[in-house]
């Protein structure tokens, strides 16, 4: 499994549109929704700089991501002009392999006697 990570700096006036497009059921996820190997995308907004976002796509492997991009090229090309208008900068952080995942168990409430 791989995670493809990008950061975006979005103009204030387009933050809502960006969030809708990259959020659940948005244009970005719809590009890949039926693609083999696509597990989903996560949209994060920086708590200190609300114009800065991180998008994390989760895929089975690089080959399936590349194939999905090729298969969705027309839709991507249609989406690109809007994206370019909304963003001030974009940086690809890269493709990462998940090595480990840690979680915190929920605390149990003390039982009443």
PLM regions with names:
Residues 2-9, 54:
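Active-site-flanking beta-strand signature of metal-NTP-handling nucleotidyl enzymes
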Residues 17, 23-39, 58-94:
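An amphipathic, aromatic/His-enriched active-site/gating alpha helix that lines ligand/cofactor pockets
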Residues 13, 48-50, 63:
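Short alpha-helical
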Residues 8-11, 15-16:
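N-terminal presequence-like segments and adjacent domain-start helices
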Residues 2, 39-52, 77-113:
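Glycine-rich beta-strand-turn "strand-cap" elements at beta-sheet edges
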């Amino acid at each position: 499994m791989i995670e493809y990570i990008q950061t975006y700096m979005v103009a204030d006036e387009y933050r809502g549109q960006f969030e809708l497009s990259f959020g659940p059921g948005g244009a970005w996820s719809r590009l890949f929704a039926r693609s083999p190997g696509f597990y989903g995308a996560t949209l994060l907004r920086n708590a200190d700089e609300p114009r800065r976002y991180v998008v994390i796509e989760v895929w089975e492997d690089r080959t399936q991501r590349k194939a999905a991009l090729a298969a969705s090229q027309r839709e991507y090309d249609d989406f690109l002009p809007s994206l370019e208008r909304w963003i001030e900068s974009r940086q690809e952080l890269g493709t990462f392999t998940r090595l480990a995942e840690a979680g915190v168990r929920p605390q149990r409430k003390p039982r009443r006697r």
